[in-house]
Amino acid sequence: LVSIGASVKDISLLLSITMVPWTLKVFLGPIIDSFTLSRFGRRRFWILISQVAMMLAVSPLVFIEVTQVNFILISLLTLHNAFVAISDIAIDALAADSLRKDQMANANGFMWGSKTLGRGFGMALATSIFYGYGINEGFLVLILLMSLAFLFPIFSKELSHKAGQQELSHKNRLTLNE
């Protein structure tokens, strides 16, 4: 954003609005716990949907010339962040369902560490691409990397029950069978 001449005020506005979906995670969790398509798995459904939606939300930014912080940029990045927040909730829930209690602390540490390293690497890569090639190209690379990340949940299989427990029918959950 600095490379296009955005002011500190513009960048602050963009960041403050695009972070709003993260404050709404508390309301999204019960929705993710309640609705699913059994064909994809209880959590994997939300991970797949949110990853596709993340890519679709930023894809216009590959074609739109970004010359300033404006309503379109803020809207698309806020929408993108909403789906990132949904994916974050679903991935955490998948980990909680897939791990035994004695594994959760270590897994949580690895997840946080991986997220921190990923953000650092991602920021360095994005900054290099944005400055070296342009913002549109940066969003194209982002979409390509998200497409690669999409392969993990596509080819993984989710447990139909909580790890360490027998398979149970989940009460209070709407499951759509195909």
Which residue stretches match the model-derived regions?
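Cytoplasmic helix-loop-helix junction between adjacent transmembrane helices
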Residues: 80-115
